[in-house]
């Protein structure tokens, strides 16, 4: 079959809720993927940061295969031998009393919202049905009805109403706006991305997260960090919140928690918060399944043992430095932290970020635009300096043709 045949079949039988680049991939290894015709590409999207450990990392795949042959699912109706090991390992890894295992990022966000509201009623003493959670404009936390109810992006929420109440929307990177919102006595939580990924890798001012964290604690409001995309080494530290020395009251993780091998997400909190939910009040058939547990342990061990946070920091500095040296009128701004980066483009002669990504594909590197004019560059954290310089050369040469 030709690439267009695969695409035609997918479009015929699949819902049209994505607009992929016209490339059909068959195999991946490390920082590379190969299409059905055998052409190799640098993967500079990494499954929206889920593939931080690289494609098909041998240690993670080995863990997957060993567990798949032993036991894959029991549901939480019974105990599994590996689940307690996973919970202990990850709680100690990130420094929390408890975790609640889920599968997807959106599920984890929903779980955190429920947990925050429950804490607000049971611990803070907010009147029934009055709890409010503060969120930021231009956020992206998922696609469920409740999550899009706090979105400010029409492509996420338009014509999907009625919407879930209970959210206060404020501008991102604005401490004064948060201070004003927290005057509401019914405010129980502040949900924030340490860096807004889908918005175009928007990095807040230094000190913003710390100031927000301090405000939350002054007002007895939970600080909830959505580190699904920024966490697990992506920004050059284990968590992006580590840059400001803050420990979220509720931490949400996903994506790279499994190294892109299986859907695994988790919500972390201490006992005072987590134990407000009792048996039967929240759950997931697949959440914490043995396969996911084994894979997640291996994925985190890879991050630790291969020093991927440190490599992300070093390679990110290299990438941004080289990008800023490119003299091209289409490059308006380079921003990011670690290996979560973006190039903000300026249209030229009718050419946009989409056209640049098509040209990058032809030259052996795949990346994807966000918001039409921004290209997100997020390679696997295992990338070497030699590989990074080769990829930068592709990007430089591609821009030179525009």
Annotate each language-model stretch with its function.
Residues 1-402:
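Conserved N-terminal phosphate-binding loop of PLP-dependent enzymes in the Aspartate aminotransferase
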């Amino acid at each position: 079959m030709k690439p267009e045949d695969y695409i035609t079949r997918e479009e015929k039988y699949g819902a049209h809720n994505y607009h992929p680049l016209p490339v059909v991939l068959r195999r991946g290894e490390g920082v590379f993927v190969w299409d059905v015709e055998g052409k190799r590409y640098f993967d500079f999207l990494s499954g929206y940061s889920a593939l931080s450990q690289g494609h098909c990392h041998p240690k993670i795949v080995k863990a997957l295969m060993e567990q798949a042959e032993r036991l894959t699912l029991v549901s939480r109706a019974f105990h599994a031998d590996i689940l307690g090991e996973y919970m202990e390992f990850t709680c100690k890894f990130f420094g929390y009393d408890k975790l609640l295992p889920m599968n997807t990022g959106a599920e984890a966000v929903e779980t955190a919202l429920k947990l925050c509201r429950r804490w607000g009623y049971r611990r803070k003493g907010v009147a029934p049905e009055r709890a409010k959670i503060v969120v930021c404009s231009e956020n992206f936390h998922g696609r469920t009805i409740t999550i899009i109810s706090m979105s400010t992006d029409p492509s996420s929420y338009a014509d999907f109403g009625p919407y879930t109440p209970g959210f206060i929307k404020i501008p991102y990177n604005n401490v004064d706006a948060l201070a004003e919102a927290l005057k509401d006595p019914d405010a129980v939580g502040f949900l924030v991305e340490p860096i807004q990924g889908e918005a175009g890798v928007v990095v807040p001012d230094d000190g913003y997260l710390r100031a927000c964290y301090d405000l939350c604690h002054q007002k007895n409001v939970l600080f909830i960090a959505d580190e699904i995309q920024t966490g697990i080494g992506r920004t050059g530290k284990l968590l992006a919140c580590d840059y400001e020395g803050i420990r979220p009251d509720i931490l949400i993780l996903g994506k790279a928690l499994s190294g892109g091998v299986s859907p695994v997400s988790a919500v972390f909190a201490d006992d005072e918060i987590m134990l407000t939910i009792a048996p039967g009040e929240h759950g997931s058939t697949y959440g914490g399944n043995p396969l996911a547990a084994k894979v997640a342990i291996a994925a985190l061990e890879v991050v630790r043992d291969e020093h991927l946070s440190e490599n992300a920091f070093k390679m990110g500095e290299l990438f941004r430095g080289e990008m800023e040296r490119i003299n091209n009128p289409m490059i308006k701004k380079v921003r990011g932290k670690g290996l979560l980066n973006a190039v903000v483009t300026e249209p030229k002669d009718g050419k946009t970020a989409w056209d640049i990504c098509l040209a990058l594909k032809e030259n052996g590197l795949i990346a994807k635009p966000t918001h039409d004019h921004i290209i997100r560059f997020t390679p696997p954290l295992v990338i070497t300096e030699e590989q990074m310089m080769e990829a930068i050369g592709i990007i430089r040469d591609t821009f030179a043709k525009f």
